[in-house]
Swiss-Prot record:
Keywords: Amphibian defense peptide, G-protein coupled receptor impairing toxin, Hydroxylation, Secreted, Toxin, Vasoactive, Vasodilator. Belongs to the bradykinin-related peptide family. GO terms for molecular function: toxin activity. It is found in: Secreted. Expressed by the skin glands. This is [Val1,Hyp2,Thr6]-bradykinyl-Gln. GO terms for cellular component: extracellular region. It comes from the Eukaryota. It comes from Pithecopus hypochondrialis. GO terms for biological process: defense response; vasodilation.
Amino acid sequence: VPPGFTPFRQ
């Protein structure tokens, strides 16, 4: 997971 990437925010 890249820094700053949030899979929870869509």
